[in-house]
C-alpha cells in the first residue's frame, strides 16, 4: 500500500529507494531523501503521514549524525513538529528525542545479543550509552549493575527517564560526562563487560575501555570497516583490533552489526582481556 501510494508521485525505483531510507520510531518517521527528489519532499512527507497509521510527524534528515553529542538536523515535512516520542523494543519502553540525542532502531538485533550475553552479577560499563537502550535491555532481566555514560546532557536525562519507566531486575547508574575522565576517576578495573558504542572513534577510547575492564573481562569493540567482500568484514575487524590493542586478548568472535555505506560496515569484535 505504501509503495503504491509513493508510486503515484515517484517512479517504482525512486519509491523503493525511499522506502529503504526511512526509519519509523514510535509515531515519527525520519526519511533520508536523495538530492534528485528534494523538490518533492513536502508531498513525500504528506504521503507518508497519510499512509502510515500511527505516525504523527514526518521529518527529513538534513544532516548526518555528528558532533560530540551525536545529534542530527531534522526538517519537519508533515504533521507535528515534535522530535520526542516513545519507542518500544523487546518489552522495554524508551522515550527518545530523535534530533537531540543519539538513537538508532537499526541496532535492535545487537542490543538483544548483548542482553542475552549479560550474566547476573556482572558490572557493565556502557561508555557511549545515548538514551540508555543497551543498558536497560541488559538490566531488564539480569541482576547486573550498569554504568551508563554519555557526554550529551539531554541523552543522560532521557536515560534517567527511561530507567524510571522500566521495571528492571538490575541497577543502572546514569552518568553525564566524558567517558575517559569518568573511568579514570571512578571506574578503573570495575567492569566485567564493556561496550564501546562509538564505532567511528573507538580507537581513541580503546585504552579507556581496557582501563575500566577487569582482567578476565570482556570488551565489545565496535568499529567501522571497509571491506570489498562482506564476508571479510569480521576478520578485518579482528585484525584491526589486534594491531591497535595494548593488552593480551582472546578473540571470542566478530560480526557485522549493520551496513553503513557501500562496502562499509559497522562491526563488533568480542574480546576477553588478561592484564
Describe each region flagged by the PLM.
Residues 1-275:
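SAM-dependent transferase fold signal centered on methyltransferase-like domains
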Amino acid at each position: 500500500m505504501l509503495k503504491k501510494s509513493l508510486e503515484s508521485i515517484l517512479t517504482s525505483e525512486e519509491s523503493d529507494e525511499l522506502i529503504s531510507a526511512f526509519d519509523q520510531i514510535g509515531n515519527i518517521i525520519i526519511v533520508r531523501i536523495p538530492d534528485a527528489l528534494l523538490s518533492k519532499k513536502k508531498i513525500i512527507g504528506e504521503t507518508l503521514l497519510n499512509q502510515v497509521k500511527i505516525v504523527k510527524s514526518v521529518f527529513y534528515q538534513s544532516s548526518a549524525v555528528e558532533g560530540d553529542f551525536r545529534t542530527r538536523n531534522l526538517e519537519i515535512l508533515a504533521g507535528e513538529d515534535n522530535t520526542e516520542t516513545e519507542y518500544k523494543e523487546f518489552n522495554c519502553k524508551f522515550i527518545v528525542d530523535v534530533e537531540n540525542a543519539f538513537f538508532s532502531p537499526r541496532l535492535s538485533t545487537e542490543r538483544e545479543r548483548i542482553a542475552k550475553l549479560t550474566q547476573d552479577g556482572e558490572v557493565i560499563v556502557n561508555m557511549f550509552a545515548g538514551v540508555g537502550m543497551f543498558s536497560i535491555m541488559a538490566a531488564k532481566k539480569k541482576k547486573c549493575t550498569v554504568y551508563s555514560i554519555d557526554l550529551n546532557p539531554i541523552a543522560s536525562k532521557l536515560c534517567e527517564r527511561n530507567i524510571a519507566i522500566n521495571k528492571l531486575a538490575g541497577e543502572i547508574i546514569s552518568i553525564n560526562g566524558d567517558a575517559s575522565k569518568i573511568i579514570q576517576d571512578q571506574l578503573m578495573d570495575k567492569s566485567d563487560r564493556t561496550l564501546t558504542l562509538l564505532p567511528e572513534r573507538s580507537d581513541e577510547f580503546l585504552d579507556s575501555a581496557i582501563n575500566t575492564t577487569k582482567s578476565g573481562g570482556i570488551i565489545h569493540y565496535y568499529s567501522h570497516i571497509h571491506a570489498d567482500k562482506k564476508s571479510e568484514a569480521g576478520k578485518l575487524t579482528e585484525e584491526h583490533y589486534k594491531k591497535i590493542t595494548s593488552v593480551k586478548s582472546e578473540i571470542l568472535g566478530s560480526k557485522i552489526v549493520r551496513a553503513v555505506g557501500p562496502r562499509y560496515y559497522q562491526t563488533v569484535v568480542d574480546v576477553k582481556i588478561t592484564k
